[in-house]
């Protein structure tokens, strides 16, 4: 038979023992904390264990990161907005310029080519026309000029070229009138070879526009051209 009195007494003893143990444990930790044996919890851990909605004012962070001046914030916003506007304007301008360059007008295309009437040019004379901002020499050569141009030994030339490679019609020589040395304009019907002479540094070109003497490294450049009719020349 079960003795309820004995069980109740045992339960009381157990409960009292647990209370004593709990009190001993709590008191032991408290005394250990007071004596410095248990370190303080880090602030982050303490904040998690004891959450609070109170705003803590940190004077140290306030000194390191002072609040901004409203006028300065407005100025920074103004500068940032203005910079974005300028950047967008530049991008728009570049795109517009690219589109316009891709669709050249008739005036631009007309300047890219030049039509010349050759009927008024006498044999043995040279005329100068302007094409793309550069002078172009057009010489109507005589039979003697043609024979002289074809009698040159190519081995003696600095920039070897046959006369036939530089003309489309033996009677007409078309070259850009810019010295290949430093860009001066040579004088026609001058020099030691009856062609052109550059007064800047003394380069001599023959009747085919080939460099024969002086510092120029290359012959006078031959532009792109074609004959529209017998007396019509299209440069470009």
Swiss-Prot record:
Q: How does it assemble?
A: Component of the ubiquinol-cytochrome c oxidoreductase (cytochrome b-c1 complex, complex III, CIII), a multisubunit enzyme composed of 3 respiratory subunits cytochrome b, cytochrome c1 and Rieske protein, 2 core protein subunits, and several low-molecular weight protein subunits. The complex exists as an obligatory dimer and forms supercomplexes (SCs) in the inner mitochondrial membrane with cytochrome c oxidase (complex IV, CIV).
Q: Which stretches are Mitochondrial matrix in the membrane topology?
A: 25-73
Q: Highest taxon of the source?
A: Eukaryota
Q: Which residues form the Rieske domain?
A: 146-234
Q: Name one GO molecular function term.
A: oxidoreductase activity
Q: How does it sit in the membrane?
A: Single-pass membrane protein
Localization terms from the record? Mitochondrion inner membrane
Transit peptide start-stop: 1-24
Q: What does this protein do?
A: Component of the ubiquinol-cytochrome c oxidoreductase, a multisubunit transmembrane complex that is part of the mitochondrial electron transport chain which drives oxidative phosphorylation.
Q: Which residues cross the membrane?
A: 74-96
The reaction(s) annotated as catalysed by this protein in its Swiss-Prot or TrEMBL entry are:
a quinol + 2 Fe(III)-[cytochrome c](out) = a quinone + 2 Fe(II)-[cytochrome c](out) + 2 H(+)(out)
Q: What keyword terms does UniProt attach to this protein?
A: 2Fe-2S, Disulfide bond, Electron transport, Iron, Iron-sulfur, Membrane, Metal-binding, Mitochondrion, Mitochondrion inner membrane, Respiratory chain, Transit peptide, Translocase, Transmembrane, Transmembrane helix, Transport
Q: Which SUPFAM superfamilies match?
A: ISP domain, ISP transmembrane anchor
Q: Primary place of residence?
A: mitochondrion
Pfam families assigned: Rieske, UCR_TM
Please share the entry's free-text remark on the cofactor: Binds 1 [2Fe-2S] cluster per subunit.
Q: What is its EC number?
A: 7.1.1.8
Further remark, if any? The Rieske protein is a high potential 2Fe-2S protein.
Q: What is this protein called?
A: Cytochrome b-c1 complex subunit Rieske-4, mitochondrial
- Does the entry annotate any disulfide bonds, and if so which pairs? 184-200
> Which terms under GO biological process does the entry name?
mitochondrial electron transport, ubiquinol to cytochrome c
Quick one: which residues bind [2Fe-2S] cluster? Answer: 179, 181, 198, 201
Cofactor(s) listed in the protein's UniProt record? [2Fe-2S] cluster
Q: Where are the Mitochondrial intermembrane topological domains?
A: 97-236
Name the protein family.
Belongs to the Rieske iron-sulfur protein family.
């Amino acid at each position: 038979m079960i003795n309820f009195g004995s069980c109740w007494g045992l339960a009381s003893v157990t409960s009292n023992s647990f209370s004593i143990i709990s009190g001993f444990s709590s008191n032991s930790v408290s005394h250990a904390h007071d004596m410095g044996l248990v370190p303080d919890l880090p602030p982050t851990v303490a904040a998690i264990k004891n959450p609070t909605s109170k705003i803590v004012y940190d004077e140290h962070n306030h000194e390191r990161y002072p609040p901004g001046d409203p006028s300065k914030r407005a100025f920074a916003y103004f500068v940032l907005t203005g910079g974005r506007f300028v950047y967008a304007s530049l991008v728009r301008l570049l795109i517009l310029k690219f589109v316009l360059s891709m669709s050249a007008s008739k005036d631009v295309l007309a300047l890219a080519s030049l039509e010349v009437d050759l009927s008024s040019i006498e044999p043995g004379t040279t005329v100068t026309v302007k094409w793309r901002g550069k002078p172009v020499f057009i010489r109507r050569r005589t039979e003697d000029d043609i024979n002289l141009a074809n009698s040159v030994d190519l081995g003696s030339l600095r920039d070897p070229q046959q006369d036939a490679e530089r003309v489309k019609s033996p009677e007409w020589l078309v070259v850009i009138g810019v010295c290949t040395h430093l860009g001066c304009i040579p004088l026609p019907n001058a020099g030691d070879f009856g062609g052109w002479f550059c007064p800047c540094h003394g380069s001599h070109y023959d009747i085919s526009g080939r460099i024969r003497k002086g510092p120029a490294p290359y012959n006078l450049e031959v532009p792109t051209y074609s004959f529209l009719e017998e007396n019509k020349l299209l440069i470009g």
